[in-house]
Amino acid sequence: MGWHDGCIRCMVGVPFASVIATVLCFAGVALFCGCGHEALSGTEKLIETYFSKNYQEYEYLIHVINAFQYVIYGIAIFFFLFGILLLAEGFYTTTAIKHILGEFKPPAIKGGLISTVTGGTPKGRSTRGRQPVHTIELICRCLGKWLGHPDKFVGVTYIITILWILIFACSAVPVYIYFNTWVTCQSIAFPGKTTTSVSTLCSDARMYGVLPWNAFPGKVCGTSLLAICKTSEFQMTFHLFIAAFVGAAATLVALLTYMVGASFNYAVLRVTGRSDRSKF
């Protein structure tokens, strides 16, 4: 019975929304970074194979793609650390709220984590004649002093969410370009659905700013474009960009969940016990 009660008490302090958001964030970032990296490499191969024969015409594009790939590496590392930090903050604030409401009082961390939020010294302890501090409790006290500012985490998460919305919007651009190309290929494959001559249906990389206007040929038309759309390189790159877009959307949902949960916990900590809903 004691083991069962201990498990129940531990489960009470688990921030389920933060755990779900962390898993969603890691999955979304992994999908965005992995698929986005490979999709950029595929785009580079398609450009240099079909749209331009002069290296100087797409040299700048290669530098931009390489820069984006390095940015992707940084995004992956940052969100790995930031996700762990926000998950720790979720555990911290949930434990503090449960302690304030009298629902969950873990003996190992009540002296370190809780006093940081409540601003006072834990009950049963005085500044004089302190007892020897165990290693776990000392670690928790240090962690509590570091994580004891949920308002700052709300602000940081809000800023990161705004920045990620911009990244999410940018990830839709290549999906739009490839989708337009795919629609053009469908019109070429089924000429009865359009009154335009097949030879005039083209995909122009210069129109999207991918290549300079003096690039040659810069565009592919008619059956040549249809042949490109049927290649595994084009289809794989198109689907990778879609997967990266979905990963960016999942990461955005995770950040919004983080922000809502952190704001809720901070509000509850401010009013100290006026609400008993703290599963974030």
Curated annotation (Swiss-Prot):
<keyword id="KW-1015">Disulfide bond</keyword>
<protein>
    <recommendedName>
        <fullName>Myelin proteolipid protein A</fullName>
    </recommendedName>
</protein>
<keyword id="KW-1003">Cell membrane</keyword>
<feature type="transmembrane region" description="Helical; Name=4">
    <location>
        <begin position="240"/>
        <end position="269"/>
    </location>
</feature>
<keyword id="KW-0812">Transmembrane</keyword>
<dbReference type="InterPro" id="IPR001614">
    <property type="entry name" value="Myelin_PLP"/>
</dbReference>
<dbReference type="GO" id="GO:0005886">
    <property type="term" value="C:plasma membrane"/>
</dbReference>
<dbReference type="GO" id="GO:0061564">
    <property type="term" value="P:axon development"/>
</dbReference>
<feature type="disulfide bond">
    <location>
        <begin position="202"/>
        <end position="221"/>
    </location>
</feature>
<dbReference type="GO" id="GO:0019911">
    <property type="term" value="F:structural constituent of myelin sheath"/>
</dbReference>
<feature type="lipid moiety-binding region" description="S-palmitoyl cysteine">
    <location>
        <position position="7"/>
    </location>
</feature>
<comment type="similarity">
    <text>Belongs to the myelin proteolipid protein family.</text>
</comment>
<feature type="topological domain" description="Extracellular">
    <location>
        <begin position="180"/>
        <end position="239"/>
    </location>
</feature>
<keyword id="KW-0449">Lipoprotein</keyword>
<feature type="topological domain" description="Cytoplasmic">
    <location>
        <begin position="270"/>
        <end position="280"/>
    </location>
</feature>
<dbReference type="Pfam" id="PF01275">
    <property type="entry name" value="Myelin_PLP"/>
</dbReference>
<feature type="lipid moiety-binding region" description="S-palmitoyl cysteine">
    <location>
        <position position="140"/>
    </location>
</feature>
<feature type="topological domain" description="Extracellular">
    <location>
        <begin position="37"/>
        <end position="59"/>
    </location>
</feature>
<dbReference type="InterPro" id="IPR018237">
    <property type="entry name" value="Myelin_PLP_CS"/>
</dbReference>
<feature type="disulfide bond">
    <location>
        <begin position="185"/>
        <end position="229"/>
    </location>
</feature>
<feature type="topological domain" description="Cytoplasmic">
    <location>
        <begin position="1"/>
        <end position="10"/>
    </location>
</feature>
<comment type="function">
    <text>This is the major myelin protein from the central nervous system. It plays an important role in the formation or maintenance of the multilamellar structure of myelin.</text>
</comment>
<keyword id="KW-0472">Membrane</keyword>
<feature type="lipid moiety-binding region" description="S-palmitoyl cysteine">
    <location>
        <position position="10"/>
    </location>
</feature>
<dbReference type="GO" id="GO:0022010">
    <property type="term" value="P:central nervous system myelination"/>
</dbReference>
<feature type="topological domain" description="Cytoplasmic">
    <location>
        <begin position="89"/>
        <end position="152"/>
    </location>
</feature>
<feature type="transmembrane region" description="Helical; Name=2">
    <location>
        <begin position="60"/>
        <end position="88"/>
    </location>
</feature>
<feature type="lipid moiety-binding region" description="S-palmitoyl cysteine">
    <location>
        <position position="142"/>
    </location>
</feature>
<dbReference type="GO" id="GO:0043209">
    <property type="term" value="C:myelin sheath"/>
</dbReference>
<keyword id="KW-1133">Transmembrane helix</keyword>
<feature type="transmembrane region" description="Helical; Name=3">
    <location>
        <begin position="153"/>
        <end position="179"/>
    </location>
</feature>
<keyword id="KW-0564">Palmitate</keyword>
<feature type="transmembrane region" description="Helical; Name=1">
    <location>
        <begin position="11"/>
        <end position="36"/>
    </location>
</feature>
